[in-house]
């Protein structure tokens, strides 16, 4: 399987602005998403190769191309929600294509993480911990649900 990470994923950053329009939090997590998939995918497939483009994958004659996309990122702060937790919610669009770039499967996965405010000393540490929990949630739900996606299951029977 070839894996393609587009620039939007590798350089992903979520910026939370204050009510006055000033940057309050900047969560640059693109590399964390890449590292997560780079850890999970080799456990799921015999061979995983990173490619710089869909076209490059086509030239390799791989069985499929996997290209994850972050569709949405939400951050919930105690000051805004009036709850004593920091929460991170991430919505992904998982795309699996043939080596020619044609659709095999396209499905949505969400991940969620939260951290109680009293467990950490700073907002930055709490947000980071909530994001780590959300990424762990993604790793487990992706690996456990992959073969449950009907189009993926159908594709796997052709290999």
Where are these regions (language model features)?
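A general alpha-helical scaffold signature found inside nucleotide-binding enzyme cores
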Residues: 32, 87-91, 129, 133
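Amphipathic alpha-helical segments that form well-ordered structural scaffolds
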Residues: 35-44, 137, 141
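Short beta-strand->alpha-helix linker/helix-N-cap micro-motif
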Residues: 38-60
């Amino acid at each position: 399987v070839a894996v393609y990470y587009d620039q939007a994923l590798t350089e992903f950053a979520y910026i939370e602005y204050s009510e006055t329009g000033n940057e309050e939090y900047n969560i640059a997590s693109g590399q964390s998403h890449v590292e997560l998939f780079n850890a999970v995918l080799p456990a799921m497939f015999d061979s995983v190769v990173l490619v710089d483009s869909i076209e490059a994958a086509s030239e390799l004659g791989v069985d499929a191309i996997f290209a994850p996309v972050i569709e949405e990122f939400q951050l919930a702060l105690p000051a805004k929600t009036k709850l004593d937790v920091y929460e991170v919610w991430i919505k992904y669009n998982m795309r699996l294509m043939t080596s020619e770039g044609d659709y095999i499967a396209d499905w949505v996965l969400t991940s969620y993480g939260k951290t109680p405010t009293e467990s950490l000393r700073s907002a930055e540490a709490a947000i980071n911990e909530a994001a780590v929990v959300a990424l762990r949630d993604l790793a487990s739900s992706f690996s456990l649900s992959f073969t449950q996606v009907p189009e993926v299951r159908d594709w796997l029977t052709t290999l």
